[in-house]
Amino acid sequence: MKMKNFLSKSLLVLLIGLIGVKSADLSDCFSSRSTWYEAIQHGNCGYEQLTGKLGPGNLMIAAAATALYNGSFACGECYEIYGPGGTGKVMIVDQCPDPGWCDTPFPHLDLSPTAFNTTIGSTVGVAMTTVKKVSCDVTGNIKAYMKDAATTNTWFEFMVFNHRVGIASISVEDSKGTITSLPRRLYNYWTYNGNAASFPVIAHVYSIYGDQVDIYLTSSAGAQLYEGVGQFADPATTFADDCTAPFPVDTDGYIYDNGLVKPLNYNHPNLGWSDWSNGVTVNWADSSTPGADSTSKVVASGTLAYNTGIQIGTDLPVEWEGRFTALEFYIKADKDFTGLVVEYNGASKSQTPSLTTTWTKYTYDLTKDLGAPASLGKPAALKFRNNGSGSVKVYLDKIRLTPVASS
């Protein structure tokens, strides 16, 4: 065993690792989706209690979908999440098992309640987010924990944790100089299973960027905690720190255009506009009448009895000031009608357009005409409500929030 080399290499990495503790960006921004779960302790990565001796020391954690978990190689890595409620950093401590959410190639993260409330809020159960991989804000050296089991010098397992970046591989070198590469298990332990190892041994821990930190293991006895001589350094990267949370609706303002609009064609929960209608069945793909212009293949229609209406909403906050100025739409009816009210839930004003049997475009200033609330997301909803006498069939097309640049 080359103790001199062991100490010199490890001390070098220790000094490099102490130069800075701020996270480094380790990937470009990418689209993700997040849910939340409550059973956050004792996750698949083996950290047991999150605030215990093996855990990250806080509850800002996530369980990664199969594609991200990568057979436990994601354990201990960190991601910064940009959501509709804010930004937060999480460590991967578990694998997300839910079919449909977590077993697809899409990068899904199941968050702790703390992380979900920080980045998304408490009013929804799922949301789209923007994510990037970052180095972890851990302090101190890399650590190892010998499994609490009947370990021997021919079979032992240990977990390595408290690392700033991901681990690529581990090998052990015994006191006779024999080096053995170890496999990583799905439960995040590294296994030695072979000829009797001559203790003490050195665990050579290699990062995904090629750094090496060594951990001196004195015996195969289980439930022992060890500290390495060093910490991985942040790699030099050129990734831009320009992530933003996905805007929950179409940034060009379209609410209805041949269907209720989903931004960027993401057909995921909470993104885009949905049918929140009250007491009326809306045909969102009515092809029985020509649309307002040549690009219209279908329109929206519904027969409104008294005090029922077509309602359109979205779950996530839509803070419109500085982005949109007005609501515009085309409307007609099966007869002349003056009892329709256009309004938002929680708004201070409403409008009553006069309907005819031909398409008419209306544009209402969100502030002056509609007194729109600061957010057009839940609980606000756009309503086309019958406040007149008798029923009326209403047709709608090209519903849009007018962007500032277009006003």
UniProtKB/Swiss-Prot annotation:
Key word Secreted present = yes
- GO cellular component labels: extracellular region
Q: Which Gene3D superfamilies match?
A: Expansin, cellulose-binding-like domain (2.60.40.760), Galactose-binding domain-like (2.60.120.260), RlpA-like domain (2.40.40.10)
| Disulfide cysteine pairs (residue numbers) | 45-75, 78-136
Which domain of life does the protein's organism represent?
Eukaryota
Give the location in the cell.
Secreted
Sugar-bearing residues? Answer: 70, 117, 387
- Annotated signal sequence is 1-23
Q: Which UniProt keywords apply?
A: Disulfide bond, Glycoprotein, Secreted, Signal
Question: Which SUPFAM superfamilies does UniProt cross-reference here?
Answer: Barwin-like endoglucanases, Galactose-binding domain-like
Would the keyword Magnesium turn up in this protein's UniProt record?
A: no
Describe the location of the Expansin-like EG45 domain by residue ranges.
42-141
Q: Which residues form a coiled coil?
A: none
State the similarity comment. Belongs to the expansin family. Expansin A subfamily.
Give a short account of what the protein does.
Answer: Unlikely to encode with a protein with expansin activity.
Specify the protein name.
Expansin-like protein 2
